[in-house]
Amino acid sequence: MSPSLVSDTQKHERGSHGVKIKHFSPYIAVCVTTFSLAFCCFMVHGAITRQPTHLLPFFFIQVFDLIICLIHILGFMSSTSDIRLVIHTKTGPIYIKSTGLTFIILSISRMMLAFKAYCLGMVWDCYKYLMLNRRGNLLDDWYSDQWGHLSTFWSLLRTGRNRGNNSIGNSGSPNEPNTRPRPDTITYDPANDLPKYEDILKIPANAYTPPPYYCSNTNGNVNTTTTDAVTTNTTITSATTVNATTTITTNANTNTSTTTSVISPLTTTNKDDTQINNASSNAHSSC
């Protein structure tokens, strides 16, 4: 390379470097760094105090950073030839093919996107964990979901974050549901929380009157049922007695009527015989 070409290249580099310094503003970098640190501290405070809403600002910053990184990668991919030209115009020229340069840029960009997506997924998982704890749900309901609650491309990045450890250790298979019994709810026993002796002395003697006397509902129902049963039996007995008496009376009346009807013809026959005998006696007397 001729000395004139080297001097022109150095001048061009100095000029471009000077333009970059003119357009660079350190105040913007300081503001971005300050806000990033503030939101990071806010996220740590929310994770310690279990307040999920404090994690949202840092989460949105990560989403914005991921989008900006993706745009930068697309810009580098569209200007690969310019990068190759800059590399070849250095003092010590480096000869590299465009295919190799594209492969290097793609590898680095994929690693950056994967790392940013992994961090974003961790923040989202922490937010969902705190929300479920606030609602009173158990961790098993969260770990039983193998695909998570954020159905995007970074849900496939599960390296180092196996959510199914608890369910696999308990049930033996990640596809089997978790059948562990839930812990019993804690009940409050008022007998263990007794009042103080001084508070009891301050209560007047007639503050609580005794309740009125009453029979037990169970005994009352049993007695009522027994009384009803006895009454029913008595009614049935009375009805049976009345029916028997009526039947006997009817039979007696029937027998009496039959006897009367039988006696009446006999009496009539006897009267006729008496009249015949009297008539024959009168005839003999006349003779």
Swiss-Prot record:
**Cell membrane keyword on record:** yes
Membrane-crossing residue ranges in chain numbering: 28-48, 56-76, 92-114
Report the function annotation for this chain. Cell surface receptor that binds to human complement C2a protein. This results in inhibition of the classical and lectin pathways of complement activation, probably due to interference with binding of C2a to C4b and interference with cleavage by C1 or MASP2 such that C3 convertase cannot be formed. This infers resistance to complement-mediated cell lysis, allowing parasite survival and infection.
Keyword Transmembrane, does the record have it?
yes
Q: Where in the cell is it found?
A: Cell membrane
Write the record's keywords in alphabetical order, separated by commas: Cell membrane, Membrane, Receptor, Transmembrane, Transmembrane helix
Q: What is its main location?
A: membrane
PANTHER family per UniProt? LYSOSOMAL-ASSOCIATED TRANSMEMBRANE PROTEIN (PTHR12479:SF10)
**An example Gene Ontology cellular component term from the record?**
lysosomal membrane
Q: Further notes on this entry?
A: The C-sensitive epimastigote form of the Colombiana strain is more susceptible to lysis than the Y strain at all human serum concentrations. Potential vaccine candidate molecule.
Location of the region described as Disordered in the Swiss-Prot/TrEMBL record: 165-190
Name this protein carries in UniProt? Tetraspanning orphan receptor
Topology relative to the membrane, per the entry?
Multi-pass membrane protein
Q: How does it assemble?
A: Interacts (via N-terminal extracellular domain) with human C2a.
Q: Where is the signal peptide?
A: none
Give the species: Trypanosoma cruzi
Q: Which residues lie on this side of the membrane: Cytoplasmic?
A: 49-55, 115-287
What happens after mutating G160S? In strain: CL Brenner
What spans does the record annotate as topological domain Extracellular, numbered to this chain? 1-27, 77-91
